[in-house]
Amino acid sequence: MDTHAFKRSLHHSERYNRRGFGRAEEVAENLEQAYQSGLIGTIRDNGYKLTHGRLNVHLAEAFGFCWGVERAVAMAYETRRHYPSERLWITNEIIHNPSVNDHLREMDVLFIPVEEGVKDFSGVTSGDVVILPAFGATVQEMQLLNERGCHIVDTTCPWVSKVWNTVEKHKKHTFTSVIHGKVKHEETLATSSFAGTYLVVLDLEEAQIVVDYILGKGDREAFMQRFAKACSEGFDPDRDLERLGVANQTTMLKSETEEIGRMFERTMLSKYGPADLNEHFLAYNTICDATQERQDAMFSLVDEPLDLLVVIGGFNSSNTTHLQEIAVSRGIRSFHIDTPDRIDETTNSIEHKPLSEDLKRDQVFLPAGPVTVGITSGASTPDRAVEAVIEKLMRLSEN
Protein backbone atom coordinates (compact mmCIF):
# COMPACT_ATOMS: atom_id res chain seq x y z
CA MET A 1 0.00 0.00 0.00
CA ASP A 2 1.23 3.49 -0.85
CA THR A 3 0.76 4.97 2.64
CA HIS A 4 2.08 8.37 1.56
CA ALA A 5 -0.53 8.64 -1.20
CA PHE A 6 -3.26 7.48 1.17
CA LYS A 7 -2.34 10.12 3.75
CA ARG A 8 -2.30 12.82 1.09
CA SER A 9 -5.74 11.75 -0.15
CA LEU A 10 -7.14 11.57 3.39
CA HIS A 11 -5.82 15.02 4.27
CA HIS A 12 -7.80 16.49 1.36
CA SER A 13 -11.06 14.83 2.43
CA GLU A 14 -13.90 17.04 3.69
CA ARG A 15 -14.44 14.49 6.46
CA TYR A 16 -10.91 14.87 7.84
CA ASN A 17 -9.72 17.53 10.29
CA ARG A 18 -6.31 17.94 11.92
CA ARG A 19 -6.39 21.68 12.66
CA GLY A 20 -9.25 21.99 15.13
CA PHE A 21 -12.50 23.89 14.71
CA GLY A 22 -11.61 27.43 15.74
CA ARG A 23 -13.23 26.96 19.13
CA ALA A 24 -10.12 27.30 21.29
CA GLU A 25 -11.52 30.25 23.26
CA GLU A 26 -14.77 28.39 23.91
CA VAL A 27 -13.01 25.47 25.61
CA ALA A 28 -10.16 27.41 27.24
CA GLU A 29 -11.96 27.86 30.56
CA ASN A 30 -12.88 24.16 30.75
CA LEU A 31 -9.28 23.17 30.10
CA GLU A 32 -7.95 25.64 32.66
CA GLN A 33 -10.32 24.42 35.36
CA ALA A 34 -9.57 20.76 34.66
CA TYR A 35 -5.83 20.80 34.16
CA GLN A 36 -4.01 24.02 35.10
CA SER A 37 -2.71 25.11 38.51
CA GLY A 38 -1.98 28.44 40.14
CA LEU A 39 0.31 26.82 42.72
CA ILE A 40 2.49 25.27 40.03
CA GLY A 41 2.78 28.66 38.33
CA THR A 42 3.95 30.19 41.61
CA ILE A 43 6.55 27.46 42.13
CA ARG A 44 7.85 27.95 38.58
CA ASP A 45 8.23 31.67 39.26
CA ASN A 46 10.17 30.83 42.44
CA GLY A 47 12.92 28.91 40.65
CA TYR A 48 10.97 25.62 40.70
CA LYS A 49 11.28 25.40 44.49
CA LEU A 50 8.83 25.54 47.39
CA THR A 51 9.52 25.61 51.12
CA HIS A 52 6.71 24.73 53.53
CA GLY A 53 7.89 24.27 57.10
CA ARG A 54 10.17 21.23 57.15
CA LEU A 55 9.27 20.35 53.55
CA ASN A 56 11.33 21.43 50.56
CA VAL A 57 9.93 20.66 47.11
CA HIS A 58 12.16 20.73 44.04
CA LEU A 59 10.32 20.56 40.72
CA ALA A 60 12.02 19.46 37.53
CA GLU A 61 12.41 22.47 35.23
CA ALA A 62 10.53 20.70 32.42
CA PHE A 63 7.63 18.41 33.26
CA GLY A 64 3.99 17.71 32.57
CA PHE A 65 1.88 18.44 29.53
CA CYS A 66 3.91 18.89 26.36
CA TRP A 67 2.67 20.93 23.42
CA GLY A 68 1.51 17.84 21.52
CA VAL A 69 -0.55 16.63 24.48
CA GLU A 70 -2.09 20.07 25.08
CA ARG A 71 -3.01 20.21 21.40
CA ALA A 72 -4.58 16.74 21.40
CA VAL A 73 -6.65 17.34 24.54
CA ALA A 74 -7.81 20.77 23.35
CA MET A 75 -8.84 19.32 19.98
CA ALA A 76 -10.83 16.59 21.73
CA TYR A 77 -12.71 19.22 23.76
CA GLU A 78 -13.25 21.31 20.62
CA THR A 79 -14.57 18.26 18.79
CA ARG A 80 -17.24 17.62 21.39
CA ARG A 81 -18.20 21.32 21.32
CA HIS A 82 -18.38 21.25 17.50
CA TYR A 83 -20.36 17.99 17.42
CA PRO A 84 -22.59 18.33 20.52
CA SER A 85 -25.04 15.56 19.63
CA GLU A 86 -23.15 13.28 17.23
CA ARG A 87 -21.81 9.95 18.37
CA LEU A 88 -18.15 10.55 19.17
CA TRP A 89 -15.49 7.84 19.40
CA ILE A 90 -11.78 7.70 20.10
CA THR A 91 -9.61 4.85 18.85
CA ASN A 92 -7.53 4.66 22.03
CA GLU A 93 -6.72 6.66 25.14
CA ILE A 94 -6.17 10.27 24.03
CA ILE A 95 -3.00 10.25 26.17
CA HIS A 96 -1.72 7.94 28.89
CA ASN A 97 -3.37 9.68 31.82
CA PRO A 98 -6.37 8.18 33.62
CA SER A 99 -7.94 11.46 34.78
CA VAL A 100 -7.84 13.00 31.30
CA ASN A 101 -9.44 9.92 29.75
CA ASP A 102 -12.08 9.86 32.50
CA HIS A 103 -12.95 13.48 31.63
CA LEU A 104 -13.53 12.43 28.02
CA ARG A 105 -15.83 9.62 29.15
CA GLU A 106 -17.78 12.18 31.18
CA MET A 107 -18.19 14.11 27.90
CA ASP A 108 -19.78 10.98 26.36
CA VAL A 109 -16.76 10.14 24.24
CA LEU A 110 -16.87 6.42 23.45
CA PHE A 111 -13.68 4.36 23.48
CA ILE A 112 -13.29 1.66 20.83
CA PRO A 113 -13.67 -1.63 22.75
CA VAL A 114 -10.82 -4.12 22.75
CA GLU A 115 -11.50 -7.87 22.69
CA GLU A 116 -8.49 -10.11 23.45
CA GLY A 117 -6.09 -7.43 22.29
CA VAL A 118 -8.01 -6.64 19.09
CA LYS A 119 -10.03 -3.44 18.60
CA ASP A 120 -13.67 -3.93 17.68
CA PHE A 121 -14.85 -1.25 15.24
CA SER A 122 -18.17 -2.97 14.54
CA GLY A 123 -20.13 -0.31 16.44
CA VAL A 124 -18.73 2.57 14.38
CA THR A 125 -21.05 3.64 11.58
CA SER A 126 -21.17 6.18 8.77
CA GLY A 127 -21.49 9.73 10.04
CA ASP A 128 -19.89 8.98 13.41
CA VAL A 129 -17.05 11.24 14.51
CA VAL A 130 -13.81 9.47 15.42
CA ILE A 131 -10.83 11.04 17.19
CA LEU A 132 -7.34 9.68 16.52
CA PRO A 133 -5.28 10.10 19.73
CA ALA A 134 -1.94 11.84 20.22
CA PHE A 135 -0.09 8.56 19.56
CA GLY A 136 -1.74 8.31 16.14
CA ALA A 137 -3.47 5.30 14.63
CA THR A 138 -2.44 2.60 12.21
CA VAL A 139 -2.92 3.26 8.53
CA GLN A 140 -5.30 0.28 8.44
CA GLU A 141 -7.52 1.92 11.08
CA MET A 142 -7.53 5.19 9.17
CA GLN A 143 -8.44 3.36 5.98
CA LEU A 144 -11.30 1.51 7.70
CA LEU A 145 -12.74 4.71 9.18
CA ASN A 146 -12.43 6.56 5.89
CA GLU A 147 -14.16 3.79 3.95
CA ARG A 148 -16.92 3.65 6.56
CA GLY A 149 -17.73 7.32 6.00
CA CYS A 150 -16.68 8.62 9.41
CA HIS A 151 -15.61 12.16 10.24
CA ILE A 152 -11.99 11.84 11.37
CA VAL A 153 -10.41 14.27 13.83
CA ASP A 154 -6.68 13.64 13.85
CA THR A 155 -4.87 14.80 17.02
CA THR A 156 -1.67 12.88 16.21
CA CYS A 157 1.36 14.69 17.61
CA PRO A 158 3.38 16.29 14.79
CA TRP A 159 6.52 14.64 16.21
CA VAL A 160 4.90 11.25 15.70
CA SER A 161 3.96 12.22 12.15
CA LYS A 162 7.61 13.15 11.60
CA VAL A 163 8.62 9.58 12.48
CA TRP A 164 6.03 8.25 10.02
CA ASN A 165 7.58 10.40 7.30
CA THR A 166 10.98 8.99 8.21
CA VAL A 167 9.99 5.33 7.89
CA GLU A 168 8.23 6.13 4.61
CA LYS A 169 11.56 7.51 3.34
CA HIS A 170 13.21 4.26 4.42
CA LYS A 171 10.57 2.33 2.49
CA LYS A 172 10.94 4.51 -0.60
CA HIS A 173 14.69 3.85 -0.73
CA THR A 174 14.33 0.12 0.19
CA PHE A 175 15.88 0.43 3.65
CA THR A 176 14.65 -1.66 6.56
CA SER A 177 13.34 0.51 9.41
CA VAL A 178 14.86 -0.41 12.76
CA ILE A 179 12.40 1.11 15.23
CA HIS A 180 13.53 1.68 18.81
CA GLY A 181 10.32 1.22 20.75
CA LYS A 182 7.91 -1.04 22.60
CA VAL A 183 6.36 -3.42 20.12
CA LYS A 184 2.84 -3.24 21.60
CA HIS A 185 2.81 0.52 22.25
CA GLU A 186 0.16 2.36 20.23
CA GLU A 187 2.70 4.72 18.72
CA THR A 188 5.03 1.94 17.58
CA LEU A 189 2.09 -0.01 16.13
CA ALA A 190 1.12 3.08 14.15
CA THR A 191 4.68 3.80 13.00
CA SER A 192 5.30 0.24 11.87
CA SER A 193 2.09 0.34 9.81
CA PHE A 194 3.62 3.13 7.71
CA ALA A 195 6.93 1.30 7.31
CA GLY A 196 7.82 -1.22 4.66
CA THR A 197 10.20 -3.81 6.05
CA TYR A 198 10.79 -3.18 9.75
CA LEU A 199 12.23 -4.58 12.96
CA VAL A 200 11.39 -3.27 16.45
CA VAL A 201 14.13 -3.34 19.10
CA LEU A 202 13.28 -2.58 22.71
CA ASP A 203 16.66 -1.70 24.15
CA LEU A 204 20.45 -1.92 23.83
CA GLU A 205 20.40 -5.65 24.53
CA GLU A 206 18.10 -6.36 21.58
CA ALA A 207 20.05 -3.94 19.39
CA GLN A 208 23.22 -5.90 20.21
CA ILE A 209 21.54 -9.14 19.14
CA VAL A 210 20.78 -7.56 15.75
CA VAL A 211 24.32 -6.17 15.46
CA ASP A 212 25.79 -9.59 16.20
CA TYR A 213 23.61 -11.18 13.53
CA ILE A 214 24.67 -8.60 10.95
CA LEU A 215 28.31 -9.42 11.72
CA GLY A 216 27.71 -13.15 11.31
CA LYS A 217 27.68 -14.06 15.00
CA GLY A 218 24.01 -14.96 15.42
CA ASP A 219 21.78 -18.00 14.98
CA ARG A 220 18.92 -17.53 12.51
CA GLU A 221 16.41 -19.69 14.37
CA ALA A 222 17.10 -18.01 17.71
CA PHE A 223 16.93 -14.59 16.06
CA MET A 224 13.57 -15.25 14.44
CA GLN A 225 12.19 -16.67 17.67
CA ARG A 226 13.28 -13.56 19.57
CA PHE A 227 11.81 -11.09 17.06
CA ALA A 228 8.87 -13.13 15.72
CA LYS A 229 6.32 -10.55 16.93
CA ALA A 230 8.54 -7.52 16.35
CA CYS A 231 9.08 -7.57 12.60
CA SER A 232 7.25 -7.14 9.32
CA GLU A 233 5.59 -10.08 7.61
CA GLY A 234 8.08 -12.21 5.69
CA PHE A 235 11.08 -10.62 7.42
CA ASP A 236 14.34 -12.34 6.45
CA PRO A 237 17.35 -11.31 8.57
CA ASP A 238 19.78 -12.53 5.93
CA ARG A 239 18.20 -10.29 3.32
CA ASP A 240 16.65 -7.44 5.29
CA LEU A 241 19.56 -6.35 7.50
CA GLU A 242 21.79 -5.14 4.66
CA ARG A 243 20.29 -1.62 4.40
CA LEU A 244 19.07 -0.01 7.62
CA GLY A 245 17.42 3.22 8.70
CA VAL A 246 16.83 4.01 12.37
CA ALA A 247 13.66 5.57 13.81
CA ASN A 248 12.14 5.58 17.27
CA GLN A 249 9.05 5.74 19.40
CA THR A 250 9.22 9.39 20.40
CA THR A 251 8.92 8.70 24.13
CA MET A 252 11.92 6.38 24.44
CA LEU A 253 15.01 7.30 26.44
CA LYS A 254 16.96 9.78 24.32
CA SER A 255 20.42 8.51 25.27
CA GLU A 256 19.44 4.94 24.44
CA THR A 257 18.00 5.87 21.03
CA GLU A 258 21.19 7.78 20.20
CA GLU A 259 23.40 4.88 21.28
CA ILE A 260 21.35 2.41 19.22
CA GLY A 261 21.79 4.66 16.19
CA ARG A 262 25.56 4.77 16.77
CA MET A 263 25.69 0.98 17.19
CA PHE A 264 24.10 0.37 13.81
CA GLU A 265 26.17 3.06 12.11
CA ARG A 266 29.42 1.54 13.46
CA THR A 267 28.26 -1.93 12.45
CA MET A 268 27.46 -0.97 8.86
CA LEU A 269 30.70 1.00 8.66
CA SER A 270 32.64 -2.04 9.84
CA LYS A 271 30.90 -4.39 7.42
CA TYR A 272 30.72 -2.24 4.29
CA GLY A 273 33.39 0.42 4.75
CA PRO A 274 33.16 4.24 4.70
CA ALA A 275 32.80 4.50 0.92
CA ASP A 276 29.56 2.48 0.92
CA LEU A 277 28.16 3.49 4.30
CA ASN A 278 25.43 5.70 2.84
CA GLU A 279 24.20 2.77 0.76
CA HIS A 280 23.64 0.74 3.92
CA PHE A 281 22.73 3.19 6.69
CA LEU A 282 20.33 6.15 6.93
CA ALA A 283 20.15 8.39 9.98
CA TYR A 284 17.33 10.81 10.81
CA ASN A 285 16.76 12.62 14.09
CA THR A 286 13.31 11.56 15.28
CA ILE A 287 13.82 12.30 18.98
CA CYS A 288 10.97 14.46 20.31
CA ASP A 289 12.05 17.83 21.72
CA ALA A 290 9.61 17.61 24.64
CA THR A 291 10.77 14.11 25.60
CA GLN A 292 14.37 15.28 25.43
CA GLU A 293 13.66 18.38 27.56
CA ARG A 294 11.93 16.35 30.28
CA GLN A 295 14.69 13.77 30.40
CA ASP A 296 17.39 16.47 30.53
CA ALA A 297 15.49 18.21 33.35
CA MET A 298 15.24 14.91 35.21
CA PHE A 299 18.99 14.35 34.96
CA SER A 300 19.47 17.82 36.48
CA LEU A 301 16.93 17.13 39.22
CA VAL A 302 18.57 13.87 40.34
CA ASP A 303 21.87 15.73 40.70
CA GLU A 304 20.30 17.69 43.57
CA PRO A 305 20.39 16.35 47.17
CA LEU A 306 16.97 14.67 47.41
CA ASP A 307 15.54 12.47 50.15
CA LEU A 308 12.94 11.03 47.82
CA LEU A 309 11.43 11.60 44.40
CA VAL A 310 7.87 11.29 43.09
CA VAL A 311 7.23 10.65 39.39
CA ILE A 312 3.62 11.26 38.34
CA GLY A 313 2.13 9.76 35.19
CA GLY A 314 0.16 6.85 33.78
CA PHE A 315 1.59 3.42 34.51
CA ASN A 316 1.35 2.66 30.78
CA SER A 317 3.10 5.93 29.90
CA SER A 318 6.42 5.19 28.23
CA ASN A 319 7.92 8.64 28.75
CA THR A 320 6.99 8.59 32.46
CA THR A 321 8.55 5.15 32.94
CA HIS A 322 11.81 6.41 31.46
CA LEU A 323 11.83 9.30 33.94
CA GLN A 324 11.49 6.74 36.72
CA GLU A 325 14.37 4.74 35.23
CA ILE A 326 16.62 7.79 35.56
CA ALA A 327 15.78 8.10 39.26
CA VAL A 328 16.34 4.39 39.87
CA SER A 329 19.69 4.49 38.06
CA ARG A 330 20.87 7.08 40.60
CA GLY A 331 19.73 5.02 43.57
CA ILE A 332 17.21 7.62 44.72
CA ARG A 333 14.21 6.48 46.76
CA SER A 334 11.54 7.09 44.16
CA PHE A 335 7.86 6.40 43.59
CA HIS A 336 5.94 6.22 40.30
CA ILE A 337 2.26 7.01 40.86
CA ASP A 338 -0.49 7.58 38.32
CA THR A 339 -2.79 9.76 40.44
CA PRO A 340 -2.49 11.77 43.69
CA ASP A 341 -4.94 9.28 45.25
CA ARG A 342 -2.06 6.80 45.58
CA ILE A 343 -0.84 8.84 48.57
CA ASP A 344 -2.77 8.02 51.76
CA GLU A 345 -2.52 10.94 54.17
CA THR A 346 -4.17 9.06 57.06
CA THR A 347 -1.44 6.39 57.14
CA ASN A 348 1.48 8.29 55.53
CA SER A 349 1.76 5.50 52.97
CA ILE A 350 2.02 5.40 49.19
CA GLU A 351 0.87 2.87 46.61
CA HIS A 352 3.25 2.94 43.67
CA LYS A 353 4.61 0.88 40.78
CA PRO A 354 8.30 -0.06 40.84
CA LEU A 355 9.92 -0.70 37.47
CA SER A 356 8.75 -3.98 35.89
CA GLU A 357 6.80 -4.90 39.04
CA ASP A 358 3.21 -4.89 40.25
CA LEU A 359 1.75 -2.22 42.49
CA LYS A 360 3.04 -2.19 46.06
CA ARG A 361 2.41 -0.07 49.15
CA ASP A 362 5.20 1.51 51.19
CA GLN A 363 4.66 2.69 54.74
CA VAL A 364 6.33 5.78 56.25
CA PHE A 365 6.27 7.52 52.88
CA LEU A 366 7.32 10.98 54.11
CA PRO A 367 10.11 10.64 56.70
CA ALA A 368 10.32 12.70 59.88
CA GLY A 369 12.44 15.82 60.10
CA PRO A 370 13.53 18.15 57.31
CA VAL A 371 12.87 16.51 53.95
CA THR A 372 13.58 17.44 50.35
CA VAL A 373 11.28 15.91 47.75
CA GLY A 374 11.92 16.00 44.02
CA ILE A 375 8.88 15.95 41.75
CA THR A 376 8.45 15.46 38.03
CA SER A 377 5.67 14.25 35.78
CA GLY A 378 5.25 12.71 32.38
CA ALA A 379 4.16 14.56 29.26
CA SER A 380 0.57 13.35 29.75
CA THR A 381 0.20 14.63 33.32
CA PRO A 382 -1.67 17.90 33.94
CA ASP A 383 -0.36 20.50 36.39
CA ARG A 384 -3.51 20.00 38.45
CA ALA A 385 -2.35 16.47 39.36
CA VAL A 386 1.11 17.72 40.34
CA GLU A 387 -0.52 20.40 42.49
CA ALA A 388 -2.61 17.78 44.30
CA VAL A 389 0.49 15.73 45.09
CA ILE A 390 2.31 18.78 46.49
CA GLU A 391 -0.69 19.75 48.60
CA LYS A 392 -0.74 16.25 50.09
CA LEU A 393 2.97 16.49 50.86
CA MET A 394 2.40 19.84 52.56
CA ARG A 395 -0.33 18.41 54.78
CA LEU A 396 1.75 15.33 55.61
CA SER A 397 4.69 17.53 56.59
CA GLU A 398 2.50 19.36 59.11
CA ASN A 399 1.75 16.16 61.07
UniProtKB/Swiss-Prot annotation:
Q: What class of enzyme is it?
A: oxidoreductase
Query: Active site: which residues?
Result: E187 (proton donor)
List, alphabetically, the Gene3D superfamilies matched. 3.40.50.11270, 4-hydroxy-3-methylbut-2-enyl diphosphate reductase, catalytic domain
Q: List the lineage, top down.
A: Bacteria, Bacillati, Cyanobacteriota, Cyanophyceae, Synechococcales
Query: Which residues of the sequence carry a binding annotation for [4Fe-4S] cluster?
Result: C66, C157, C288
Q: Which domain of life is it from?
A: Bacteria
Q: What is this protein called?
A: 4-hydroxy-3-methylbut-2-enyl diphosphate reductase
Q: Which GO terms describe its molecular function?
A: 4 iron, 4 sulfur cluster binding; 4-hydroxy-3-methylbut-2-enyl diphosphate reductase activity; metal ion binding
Per the UniProt record, the source organism is Synechococcus sp. (strain CC9902)
Going by the UniProt record, its keywords in alphabetical order are:
4Fe-4S, Iron, Iron-sulfur, Isoprene biosynthesis, Metal-binding, Oxidoreductase
Q: In which pathway does it act?
A: Isoprenoid biosynthesis; dimethylallyl diphosphate biosynthesis; dimethylallyl diphosphate from (2E)-4-hydroxy-3-methylbutenyl diphosphate: step 1/1; Isoprenoid biosynthesis; isopentenyl diphosphate biosynthesis via DXP pathway; isopentenyl diphosphate from 1-deoxy-D-xylulose 5-phosphate: step 6/6
- PANTHER family on file: 4-HYDROXY-3-METHYLBUT-2-ENYL DIPHOSPHATE REDUCTASE, CHLOROPLASTIC
